[in-house]
């Protein structure tokens, strides 16, 4: 037996403010299939859909749904169906649904599929009950079939963070992409089975910043650089003094 969605009250959010301004560089770029798209524009739309559903941190080859992309490029499915396919894929289930509790997963999906943050804990509980009674497919279908989704994105537009920037405010809301893929509870489980142990703090932030040689090699290089620079400087000074007749070479 499935339960109806529990009622919850909306709260004040940027996306509830009526939009009258002209879109600029600070506003979200809208990807839609309204009109004819070139092959490159179609690829950009597909990439935007992956980025919206999986987030930038999960833009990896193993998450690609080749068959779904083929259906979309051949106009067999709409943008909404493509988003639905990504959210119901095995990759999304394993990397997002199975590593989060229902409350956190609800927040992630509302951010990514409806383009806003959750209104309250009551909304988290309401949608968590949908997951418990209808499962992941039922929850995703409820979101994508909702009036809110259809009014804002319809069948042809990739979801995006709505009204992140308001011209009346100095700063906008933080992007939803900052939210990690899993929470502290799942990290504790990983630590319990041996992950993240005995790891020295990194001296670099990204892998491409990692020094390819040992520290001693760089120290020797610095010594050679400074000594060589000093010798070259002395040579230039000696040549100049010789040219002026002050010293003889």
Swiss-Prot record:
Source taxon at top rank: Bacteria
* Stated role: Rod linker protein, associated with phycocyanin. Linker polypeptides determine the state of aggregation and the location of the disk-shaped phycobiliprotein units within the phycobilisome and modulate their spectroscopic properties in order to mediate a directed and optimal energy transfer. Plays a role in energy transfer from the phycobilisome to photosystem I (PSI). Although able to transfer energy to both photosystems, this is predominantly a PSI antenna.
- Designated gene of the protein: cpcL
Q: Where in the cell is it found?
A: Cellular thylakoid membrane
High-level lineage: Bacteria, Bacillati, Cyanobacteriota, Cyanophyceae, Synechococcales
Per the database record, which ranges form the PBS-linker domain?
11-189
Its record classes its membrane topology as:
Single-pass membrane protein
Q: Which Gene Ontology BP annotations are present?
A: photosynthesis
Q: Which family does it belong to?
A: Belongs to the phycobilisome linker protein family.
List the keywords (alphabetical).
Antenna complex, Membrane, Phycobilisome, Thylakoid, Transmembrane, Transmembrane helix
Protein name listed in UniProt:
Photosystem I-associated linker protein CpcL
Per the record, what is one GO cellular component?
phycobilisome
Q: Per the record, what phenotype accompanies loss of this gene's function?
A: No visible growth phenotype, decreased energy transfer to photosystem I. Decreased accumulation of phycocyanin (PC), but no major effects on the phycobilisome supercomplex. A double cpcG1/cpcG2 deletion has even less PC. No change in state 2 to state 1 transitions (i.e. energy transfer to PSII).
Q: Which organism is it from?
A: Synechocystis sp. (strain ATCC 27184 / PCC 6803 / Kazusa)
